[in-house]
Amino acid sequence: MAKVVGIDLGTTNSVVAVMEGGKPTVITNSEGGTTTPSVVAYAKNGDLLVGQIAKRQAVINSENTFYSVKRFIGRPSKEVSDELRQTPYKIEDSEGKIRLKCPNLNKNFAAEEISAQVLRKLVNDANKYLGEKVEKAVITVPAYFNDSQRQATKDAGKIAGLEVLRIINEPTAASLAYGLDKKDNETILVFDLGGGTFDVSILEVGDGVFEVLSTSGDTRLGGDDFDEKIVKWLLNEFEKEEKFSLKGDSQALQRLTEAAEKAKIELSSLSQTEINLPFITANENGAKHIEKTLTGEKFESLCSDLFDRCRIPVENALKDAKLKPNQIDEVVLVGGSTRIPAVKKLVKDILGKEPNETVNPDEVVAIGAAIQAGVLSGEVKDILLLDVTPLSLGVETLGGVTTKIIPRNTTVPTKKSEIFSTAVDNQPNVEIHVLQGEREFARDNKSLGTFRLDGILPAPRGIPQIEVTFDIDANGILSVTAQDKGTSKQQSITISGASTLPKEEVEKMVKEAEQNAAADKEKGENIRVKNEADLYCYQAEKQISELPEALVNENQSLIKESKETVEMLKENIKKEDYDKIKENLKKLQEKLMEIGQKAYAKKEPLKDEDSNKAGSQDDFIDADFTESK
C-alpha cells in the first residue's frame, strides 16, 4: 500500500511525518528543517512562496504574505472581528465569509486555499523524501475545533490534492506519540498550547488502548496572542515617546510582530531580552527607532490575563473526567508556547507535578498523526483509539431552546436518535436547526446548518413522530437525518455547509490547484536551468582564462566558439528564453568537456589550482538556488 503521511497543520508551523520500519519519522523539508512555517506569500511577479522563504520576505511584502490563517479556517467573519484587526494583510467580508485579499494577484482567497498551499508544500517535501507520490494523509486539528472547522480542514486537504483519510485531534495525536510503547496504564493530561489554539485532553493510555476521557479548550488562545501583547506594549511605548502612532503602518506592524515573536522565544531561556528596530519609520523630524528591554517579569505582567485563560480548560477537563489533579499520572506539554516558563509554572501549580518534557513539543503531534496513518494503512497493529466529540450537538426546539442529542465528551464514532413532534396542529413540515455548543439557547450556540422535512400528514400537534438521528464519524464530522415515522419520509444533511466553501467552489479550487501545480513545477524547472546556465557561464569564463597559453594557441577555434556560446547563453538568460538556454547550455557543456579532455591529454595543469573548485561546488550552489525557489 502507498505511504500515508501524518500532518500537523499548525497555526505558526507545520510538520509532516511517516512510519518507516515500524517507527514514526519526521520528514525533513527542502530547506533542511523539520518544521515549515505556515506562511504563504505572492511576489510582485505572481510567484508563489511557501514556508521559510515566504516568512523571510514578509516585512517587505506584508500585504501579500498570509500567516496564522488557521485562526480563520471554517469560521464566519462575525466570529473573528478581533483577529481581523491584528493582521498586516487585508481581510474582506464576502457575504459573511472571510476572504484574504492579495493585491499582487488582484484576487481574494479563502483560508482553505492558503492552508492548501502549506499542505501541498509538505506533501512535495514528503514526495522527495520517500521517492514516491503521496496522495493520502491524516491531518490533525485542535480538539476544540467545531464541525465547520473540521470540514474546512478536509476541504483544504482536498484542494491540495490529498485524500484525507482521517481528521484526528491534536492532543490525541500527541498521546499516541507519547504512549506508543507504554505497557502500564496511565492517566495523562495533554496540555497543548500552539500558535493559535489551546486544547486540554485527559486520556487513559496503556497497552495499545488510547481512550479520551474528556477534552476542553479555547480556539482563540495561542502564541499569537502572547506576541500581540508585546506588539501592543511596543506600540503604546512608541506613541508615548514620539507622539504619533504606528498602527496604520503595515510594514512596521510586520516588523513589530516578528520582533515580538523573537523576544517571546528568547525569554524562554533568558531573564530579559533587547528589542532593537532601527528605522521603524520616519517623519519630518527624521528616522525613528525602537530600542526596548523586555524582562521576563514584564512579559508575564503583560500576559497575565492569557495565563488566567489557560487555567479554565484544565479545570473543565478535570471536572468532565471526574478526576482530581492528584489522579493525573503524567502531564505532556505540546506546542511551542509551552516553552514559556510561566506556562510550565502554571501547569505545575494546577496539577502539583512537574510536566513531562521527554517529547519534542513541535514534532509530537505530527508523529502521532503518522502513527494513526500507520494504523489506517495496516502498518501499525494493536492500537485502539477512542476519541470524543469536544462540544455537545443538538437541535433547536420550541422557544429557541437547544435540546442536546449528543453530549460533549461522547466517544466517537457514535449514533444517537431522539423523537420530536410538531408544535402546531396540521403542521405540514418541520425545520431542523442543527446546533453545536453548551449554551441553553440556540442563539448562543454555533449554528451548523438547517434542513426541512416536508410531507407530514395533517394531525393534532404532538401526534406526528419525527425521529432525528445524529451520526458522527471517526473524523468528528456530523450528518443528521430526520424521518417521519408515520410516512417513512426522510431528509438528511451532512454538515458541510458549515464550511466556508460550497462543494462546487472546492472542486473548482482543486482544479485550479492542479493547474497551478503544473505551472509551478515548470517555473521551478526553468529557475533550476537558468541557475545552472548562469553557473556554467561563470565556470567557462574562469576555466578559459586559466588555460595554458600553448593550449589556447592550439585550439583558437574551440576557445572562440566557447566564448561565443557563453555570450549567447548570457543573452538567453537575460531574455528568459528557456528553450534557447537549454540548447546553448548543452553546447557549452560539450565544449567545456572537449577543452577539459584536451587539457588532460596535454597533462598541463591550469594556472590556478583552485579552478576546479568552482566545479566541485556545483551541487552546493545548485542546492542554494533550489532553496530559494
Swiss-Prot record:
GO terms for cellular component: chloroplast. Coiled coil: none annotated. It is found in: Plastid, Chloroplast. Residues 619-629 have a biased composition (Acidic residues). Keywords: ATP-binding, Chaperone, Chloroplast, Nucleotide-binding, Plastid, Stress response. It comes from the Eukaryota. SUPFAM superfamilies: Actin-like ATPase domain, Heat shock protein 70kD (HSP70), peptide-binding domain. Its main location: plastid. InterPro entries: ATPase_NBD, Chaperone_DnaK, Heat_shock_70_CS, HSP70_peptide-bd_sf, Hsp_70_fam. HAMAP family: DnaK. Belongs to the heat shock protein 70 family. NCBIfam families: PRK00290.1, prok_dnaK. This is Chaperone protein dnaK. It comes from Diacronema lutheri (Unicellular marine alga). The lineage of its organism: Eukaryota, Haptista, Haptophyta, Pavlovales, Pavlovaceae. The gene is dnaK.
